[in-house]
Amino acid sequence: MADGEEPEKKRRRIEELLAEKMAVDGGCGDTGDWEGRWNHVKKFLERSGPFTHPDFEPSTESLQFLLDTCKVLVIGAGGLGCELLKNLALSGFRQIHVIDMDTIDVSNLNRQFLFRPKDIGRPKAEVAAEFLNDRVPNCNVVPHFNKIQDFNDTFYRQFHIIVCGLDSIIARRWINGMLISLLNYEDGVLDPSSIVPLIDGGTEGFKGNARVILPGMTACIECTLELYPPQVNFPMCTIASMPRLPEHCIEYVRMLQWPKEQPFGEGVPLDGDDPEHIQWIFQKSLERASQYNIRGVTYRLTQGVVKRIIPAVASTNAVIAAVCATEVFKIATSAYIPLNNYLVFNDVDGLYTYTFEAERKENCPACSQLPQNIQFSPSAKLQEVLDYLTNSASLQMKSPAITATLEGKNRTLYLQSVTSIEERTRPNLSKTLKELGLVDGQELAVADVTTPQTVLFKLHFTS
């Protein structure tokens, strides 16, 4: 190529040369696999090394399994989910499903790189799938603009691995319970083929964690529930009478003024994704803050308090997503021993990582298959049982529904989620366990939004 050629001619010539090379190499063809495309993956799968699994035998079959067969479900398409989807798609995983119930907000664009300004208001799952399917040849990402609770066991059973990038503990607990419900036991022995591995990642600011869960074999979410701090709630007396923080003012407007004034019409609930709703809360919070000489109420803080927004840092998402994607790769190929089983990451003051083995809980309400023993006096009221279920660090239920078999009939003692039944069963809360007809050794079945399964409790009376 002559040195005097203009830049445009040089560019065209380079494009022609690249096109010729692609034609010689076979191009993308129908498979979208040009020569050398998967060399970076083959290095891990077609040769052994000091870190490979002792039973691993290098072959071409593992790569073909990734490309043609392995189905992975990614739950969450936010900051962590975008990183996960990108990593998996570029690592050879082609059969990917993604679930997310959220839509794209302008505040997402600084770190959720699969989205653009034109996508604001559209479902995250659909936009992420479109982007990857268009950008990565032969990648088939199937979107689901749904809640995870919208799908049954048949749907989840089809996947080889499930990886989560969630910001909700309730959602984590639900999918954990679903995967445990898929397990099959023969004469008390777990059938390994019924296990769907769960890779869970989470981030908050400059901190993050990743864990590998083999349901029925290793510690599940419920086994280590105490590791999750309870949601911070401000006392109502402080919010109403003695506010000291800007958050107190915002919570006052959210919890008291909104239901009282109903600014957007009777029965219209507060929508944290509606700018008009947030603006109304913001203005009223400013007014209350000025009454008590409190500074710091901003629109961003208002949005964060109303939506319970967790602070996000793009670099933390990238690190944790890389760990999770690596674990998916290790389990899918059996080439390397997976993480055992919990990793924490912290780069607040430097860089710190630590890995440890979380142990299974013998009486775990989710994976132990044992009824949970609870002790109460016969004179204790049902309200005390309800408080125990919601306040216990090892249970942390949100709206438990309690049923029991009395005189051969299944009887609902209390159910909160259905208004008519809640009104009918509310008087039971002030009754003693003895008055309700419960006896020592009675089994109580408790349903809750945190799990798709019913949790069994065995009631023991204390003297």
From Swiss-Prot:
Changing residue 369 to P: No effect on NEDD8 transfer to UBE2M. The record marks 211 as: Determines specificity for NEDD8. CDD domains: Uba3_RUB. ATP binds at residues 100-124, 148-171. Residues 242-248, 292-295 are annotated as: Interaction with NAE1. Arg-211 acts as a selectivity gate, preventing misactivation of ubiquitin by this NEDD8-specific E1 complex. Catalytic subunit of the dimeric UBA3-NAE1 E1 enzyme. E1 activates NEDD8 by first adenylating its C-terminal glycine residue with ATP, thereafter linking this residue to the side chain of the catalytic cysteine, yielding a NEDD8-UBA3 thioester and free AMP. E1 finally transfers NEDD8 to the catalytic cysteine of UBE2M. Down-regulates steroid receptor activity. Necessary for cell cycle progression. This is NEDD8-activating enzyme E1 catalytic subunit.
